[in-house]
From Swiss-Prot:
Subunit structure, interactors included: F-type ATPases have 2 components, CF(1) - the catalytic core - and CF(0) - the membrane proton channel. CF(1) has five subunits: alpha(3), beta(3), gamma(1), delta(1), epsilon(1). CF(0) has three main subunits: a, b and c.
Protein's organism: Emiliania huxleyi
Keyword Plastid: yes
Main location: plastid
Keyword Repeat in annotation: no
Name under which the protein is recorded: ATP synthase epsilon chain, chloroplastic
GO terms assigned for molecular function: ATP binding; proton-transporting ATP synthase activity, rotational mechanism
Length: 130
């Protein structure tokens, strides 16, 4: 038996297929989902989701949201998602370096918070291609 996984963003369905295993970046840490998992509703953090399908692992960067698990169906609603295979490692590394400077140069509390969120996104993108 497998898991039916749907990843939905405001503008498109990013993934709608079966998987054998799923690892989610929940707000309390990494969360592993296998078949016949107990029903669950959880908040998702910025991070990397990994799913195993056909014996291979596929990575996606998720930009916060929610996941519902029920009867081997996982619905993920998130603000944004990007498949790891579509991310260029050198571009992701350059973006991380640029955002790190923005965090250091942030003058106001608002700028610091915004730059820190962008830093978390950049780290997740780089982690997805690693």
């Amino acid at each position: 038996m497998s898991l039916n996984v749907r990843v939905i963003t405001p503008d498109r369905i990013v993934w709608d297929a079966n998987a054998e295993e799923l690892i989610l970046p929940s707000s309390t840490g990494q969360l592993g989902i296998l078949t016949d998992h107990a029903p669950l509703l959880t908040a998702l953090d910025i991070g990397v989701m990994r799913l195993k399908t056909g014996g291979n692992w596929i990575s996606f960067v998720l930009m916060e949201g929610f996941a519902e698990v029920e009867d081997n169906k996982i619905t993920i609603l998130c603000n944004g998602a990007e498949e790891g295979a579509s991310i260029d490692a050198s571009t992701a590394q350059a973006a991380l370096e640029k955002v790190t400077l923005l965090v250091d140069e942030a003058a106001t509390k608002k700028e610091k918070i915004e730059a820190t969120i962008e830093l978390r996104k950049a780290k997740a993108r780089l982690q997805a291609v690693a």
